[in-house]
Amino acid sequence: GSLYIISSVFKNNKGGLAPNTLDSELLPPERETFIIGNLIENNNNVDAPATQSTNLSLGNGVVIAGGNNNVIKNNVIANHNLYGVIITATADVNYWPAHGNRVESNLIINSKRADIASSGLSNLGNCFENNYFNTSIPPGLQTLNNCDSSFYPLSADLSGMWSSLARVIQTSDGNYSQGDWRTFEAPANQPNMPIMDELMSFGYD
């Protein structure tokens, strides 16, 4: 809980951001991640290095998989082959629905399957408000699951969850496209964050 991802850029990866719940974690479910003011674009790169679990997020901007009480706000999310933002239940040893997530005031465009989506059984209290987008699964998702309105049980659409489970099966034997990090050119030197320059001036290097 209380993880803040703010004013950052995520692009040309397999997937953008994917807060998720696994039974192997210390205190599941995942909860209270704040994704605010980021640029998340073009995360469809099959050649990016990846583990099996990373491959599951391929082609998505933000995936909340079995997470609770997360906030996705004021982001630009563009050009993804599957979903811009999807809130979905997930299955590990246990079934983990997604509850109480808020998607607000984002620009979400050019997603091939849907810009915003909700999938899975028993998801409650997820809301969508003031987002600019073109497509949603199910249709009418923001209108009927607005943050200031009553909840309508649209989240019973299962297409997103089945898509994820199909990819789990597909990648279970390690047979999926990925790059080798050892062959990538080293990136150019990047500027430090201002706080790091200040710490280094005190000898913390």
Q: For the regions a protein language model found, what residue spans apply to each?
A:
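Acidic, glycine- and Ser/Thr-rich low-complexity intrinsically disordered tracts
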Residues: 111-205
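Short, recurrent motifs enriched in small/polar residues
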Residues: 26-27, 94-95
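Short glycine/acidic-rich loop motifs that flank beta-strands on beta-rich extracellular proteins
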Residues: 1, 14-21, 28, 44-52, ...
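Right-handed parallel beta-helix
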Residues: 2-15, 29-46, 68-79, 99-110, ...
